[in-house]
Amino acid sequence: MLDKIVIANRGEIALRILRACKELGIKTVAVHSSADRDLKHVLLADETVCIGPAPSVKSYLNIPAIISAAEITGAVAIHPGYGFLSENANFAEQVERSGFIFIGPKAETIRLMGDKVSAIAAMKKAGVPCVPGSDGPLGDDMDKNRAIAKRIGYPVIIKASGGGGGRGMRVVRGDAELAQSISMTRAEAKAAFSNDMVYMEKYLENPRHVEIQVLADGQGNAIYLAERDCSMQRRHQKVVEEAPAPGITPELRRYIGERCAKACVDIGYRGAGTFEFLFENGEFYFIEMNTRIQVEHPVTEMITGVDLIKEQLRIAAGQPLSIKQEEVHVRGHAVECRINAEDPNTFLPSPGKITRFHAPGGFGVRWESHIYAGYTVPPYYDSMIGKLICYGENRDVAIARMKNALQELIIDGIKTNVDLQIRIMNDENFQHGGTNIHYLEKKLGLQEK
């Protein structure tokens, strides 16, 4: 097993990684910015290293500082968590080149799956169903581009190859706006991702977001751990996640899961990963793969009993998968609500000092967070301050537990989205299950005209 690792992240995921390390007897090094010296995992870690000032660019995105921290503390591996450098192939490469283990896939795998065009090509080759599209980047010949759009059928969506998180995409409903949409997406992509390659896909009007969790050891073994539904979104950011996804039959789960596991073996995948799909009219369409642990991983842990972070650590230590596919069983249902420090009306971040705090509890309730009374939420980072996960023997029980837990949760001193989460849990259509990715924005009156 790994002797000592650097946790190259902050907030709740850093604490989650620290807990898994402690259970496995792994020593921990918490790297932090000057604004984060009071974070819970920093206070609990075996060693701490301040890697720079508050802005992420100078701390959590500062590759030389993170690698130096590993060197001076004698760590053997670096866990990137999610966000920040977790899907940065150059970081993974530099970590390995410096003699450390990157807890995640190989750099070339991150590169392959990070570029949407090469990722789609690899998935098609592996037999994973994809959205009908341009099968490669779009050129400058508008006659050819119009022909592609005609073959796919309007509406289509123009996407940046290096994009993600809802950035660098445009819906086109007819020939008249095609040329302008392509050039605008190109310009945006060049500015945001330094890569102006764009491609075209069929635009699905009312899909759900369903994703498959996978684990692969890079030694020819890969398993899928059922699916999650993350359709409750605002501005392409997930708000509520659940597992399993309502209405997905065991046959459908096996069909798509086996293809994802096979794809992992085909591309030599190592670690935890997630295949994201749009799901419409009983069909799955691959959109992207996240080559890291995800925010919503706890709902999968609750229904399968598999500790995904511990599995990541074991795989990084060179161990084969500790579970076989036939040992993965789905039991019950889990729902996760992301708790954000934000104004419930404007959705603007609401940093500040937490004056009073009480975490919910009870059977089937899990609270993943780094906050405490007296903790100051800094203005420099993502607004998520916690995740509330509730488990039940079925979906109705999980939702009922979540309603109670949300009402028990007290966070005073800052504004949060707890009331919004209560509204979602009480929403009839959500309770029925199967709402699409546009539902929450329509409910909030935010749908762009």
Swiss-Prot record:
Mg(2+) 2 binds at E288, N290. ATP binds at K116, K159, G165, G166, E201, K202, Y203, L204, H209, H236, E276, E288. This protein is a component of the acetyl coenzyme A carboxylase complex; first, biotin carboxylase catalyzes the carboxylation of the carrier protein and then the transcarboxylase transfers the carboxyl group to form malonyl-CoA. This is Biotin carboxylase. Changing R366E: Loss of homodimerization. No effect on ATP binding. Hydrogencarbonate binds at K238, R292, V295, R338. Changing E296A: Severe reduction in catalytic activity. Binds 2 magnesium or manganese ions per subunit. PROSITE patterns: ATP_GRASP (PS50975), BC (PS50979), CPSASE_1 (PS00866), CPSASE_2 (PS00867). The active site is at R292. Mn(2+) 1 binds at E276, E288. The gene is accC. It comes from Escherichia coli (strain K12). Its EC number is 6.3.4.14. Keywords: ATP-binding, Biotin, Fatty acid biosynthesis, Fatty acid metabolism, Ligase, Lipid biosynthesis, Lipid metabolism, Magnesium, Manganese, Metal-binding, Nucleotide-binding. The lineage of its organism: Bacteria, Pseudomonadati, Pseudomonadota, Gammaproteobacteria, Enterobacterales. Acetyl-CoA carboxylase is a heterohexamer of biotin carboxyl carrier protein, biotin carboxylase and the two subunits of carboxyl transferase in a 2:2 complex. Transmembrane segments: none annotated. Residues 1-445 form the Biotin carboxylation domain.
